[in-house]
Regions:
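A nucleotide-sugar donor-handling region in carbohydrate enzymes
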Residues: 124, 129-209
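Glycine-rich phosphate-binding "P-loop"
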Residues: 1-4, 63-70, 213-220, 250-265
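Active-site-adjacent loop/helix micro-motif of nuclease/hydrolase catalytic cores
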Residues: 11-14, 221-227, 270-274
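Conserved catalytic-core segment of nucleotide-activated headgroup transferases in glycan assembly
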Residues: 195-197, 201, 207-245, 249
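Donor nucleotide-activated moiety binding/catalytic core segment of transferases
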Residues: 247-292
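Active-site and donor-binding regions of nucleotide-sugar-utilizing enzymes
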Residues: 4-153, 291
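Short hydrophobic beta-strand segments
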Residues: 1-7, 29-31, 89-97, 162, ...
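Short boundary motifs at domain starts and secondary-structure transition points
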Residues: 19-21, 82-86, 196-207, 275
């Protein structure tokens, strides 16, 4: 049996793609509630039949800005998850997050039942190519151990699956494995993702827009985002533009600029481009790797 961890929509896409590409019939998905509509998405994942079991997990993803309240909630939910998975045994577990805390929660849960479990990473965008996962503040390891978790610091990784392994030059643990590219001609993949994220070609909000603004989710550093977008919005045709909020946003931060805002917050851009031709469209973003 294999376990996959899904948080933001892109990680769910990766898990679905990986299972279909490898024809697995023994995979479970653990989907963490980190975005609006997660419950509905989880149910639609079940309906596709891609996974043997799909479990909805209370939020254990610590996001910025980090607060004491968030830390307490994450640890509390993590403890409940450990209790609920006590009798589940897996041979392999696939992670696709850069956070030590969330990965340590799943690592602790699954490694206690099988000490020889294979730990594997699926890349999570450009961050996998530019950041050393094992490079974290020393106190984080201490805190994770203090709350009774085994620290998933990367040293126990067996494999890292990447779409472009030739671009990986960062320090890492585990063998690098090339992932099968996503293919819009793969009918099963496209139909599954369209259903999961409630995509319907006849109601596509981006088809008649030439400019797509991709908003960014919460970051651990500050920058003049308002000033950046103010300059951009002065130089574009607003009637030909649409804003795509980040899946973790509750509301768009650009909502009062007279520009149409996409209503399907949870629709990942990767699903959109599997269905339409974006060659002649202009994408504007600050950090979003989906544009690449």
């Amino acid at each position: 049996m294999r376990a996959f961890v899904g948080t933001v929509p892109f990680t769910i896409i990766e898990a679905v793609h990986f299972v279909i590409a490898n024809n697995y019939d023994d995979a479970d998905l653990y989907m963490v509630k980190v975005f609006d509509g997660a419950e509905d998405v989880c149910e639609r994942v079940r309906q596709t039949g891609v996974f043997k079991n799909v479990y909805l997990v209370e939020d254990v993803l610590l996001t910025y800005p980090i607060t004491i309240e968030k830390c307490i909630r994450t640890v509390k939910n993590g403890k409940a998850f450990l209790k609920s998975t006590r009798n589940r045994i897996y041979d392999e577990v696939y992670y696709n997050n850069s956070g030590w805390l969330i990965n340590s929660i799943f690592y602790t849960a699954f490694s206690r039942a099988n000490k020889n479990i294979k730990n594997k990473f699926l890349e999570h965008g450009f961050n996998s190519y530019t950041t050393v996962y094992s490079d974290k503040p020393f106190y984080l390891r201490v805190l994770i151990r203090l709350v009774g978790l085994k620290c998933m610091d990367g040293t126990m990784l067996d494999e890292i699956h990447m779409f472009h392994p030739e671009l990986m030059h960062m320090k890492h643990y585990g063998r690098i494995v090339k992932m099968t590219p996503m293919d819009r001609k793969n009918t099963r993949l496209v139909e599954a993702l369209n259903h999961i994220f409630n995509y319907h070609p006849e109601t596509d909000e981006f088809a008649d827009r030439d400019i797509i603004i991709m908003e960014q989710g919460p970051q651990k550093f500050t920058f003049d985002k308002e000033g950046f977008w103010k300059k951009v919005l002065k130089n574009i045709d607003k009637q030909k533009t649409i804003i795509k909020p980040h899946p973790r946003q509750k509301n768009s931060t650009l909502g009062e600029n007279g520009i149409k805002i996409s209503t399907n917050y949870t629709l990942p851009w990767e699903v959109e481009i599997l269905n339409i031709d974006i060659e002649k469209k202009t994408q504007i973003t600050i950090f979003s790797g989906a544009c690449v």
